[in-house]
Amino acid sequence: MFSDDKEANKGTIKLAYAQQDDQIVSTNVIAQVLEEQGYKVDTTSLDIPVTWEAVSKGEVDAMTGAWLPITHGAEYKKVKNDIDNLGPHIDKEAKLGLVVPKYMDVNSIEDLNNQANKKITGIEPGAEIVDATNETLKAYPNLKGWEQINSSTGAMNAELKRAIKNKDDIIITGWNRYWIFQRYDLKYLDDPKGSMGKAESINTIARKGLKEDEPEAYRILDNFKWSVKDMESIMLEIENGKDPEKATKEWIDNNRDKVDKWTEK
């Protein structure tokens, strides 16, 4: 995925990721940092269950897309004795929820009554957040008669843009590590019943033996810590048309104090 002018003089690190924005961005960042330290980095896109299997079998060295303890809890349970869980690089900031523009005079799901024609604008059917929203419609008595409208993430983004331009009411399904939070003034609605789920962490997972085989790379992966805001800032640059590799490099260059903590010995 990446190129580096200088000749790598260390080993090759193999990273796996799924085709999700948060995994792509975090993999890009840690790959470029490893390359700066002299490693050659190979990245492979796999389905989520296969990423776990590949790390557990030692077919790849690491991944940065482990949502724990809930979303990937079943995958983790299957292989937890065959991997090293290096802990969160995003600590308890990954969440799903119902999101509205800040100009709307509602702060909780319980405040909803007839806003936006009793419609929640969602994404593709089958996504986890779609199921959570359907559970929320059942959990809150004030949402009786409401419905979730599903099409695509792009269509939801277009509806959000239109609504904000006109200062119309809109309720969308939202999640942290998404560029819309950097572009618009949005807020999560409180979820006292917890039907949208709790905030999770995104962890780095390494294969057994990587610590002994490549101790410096292992240490960098172990030290990798940043925030949802960091991640979303890169996503926004890419959404605005910047080349992903360039957007990643610029973030690294502008956050040397943070990156230096990952690479310090």
Please place each PLM-identified region on the residue numbering.
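A bilobed periplasmic-binding-protein/Venus flytrap-type ligand-binding module shared by bacterial periplasmic
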Residues: 95-105, 200-214
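Ligand-binding cleft/hinge of the Venus flytrap
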Residues: 29-37, 116, 122-148, 253
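Short, well-ordered beta-strand elements
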Residues: 7-22, 34, 39-44, 117-121, ...
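Ligand-binding pocket segment of bilobal, Venus flytrap-like solute-binding proteins
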Residues: 60-64, 132-194
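An extracytoplasmic/periplasmic, membrane-proximal ligand-sensing/linker region
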Residues: 11-13, 21-24, 136-144, 153-167, ...
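Pocket-flanking alpha-helical
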Residues: 27, 47-81, 158-159, 179-184
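Short helix-initiation/N-cap motifs at beta->coil->alpha
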Residues: 18-21, 42-54, 148-159
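A conserved helix-loop-strand patch within extracytoplasmic ligand-binding domains
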Residues: 80-129
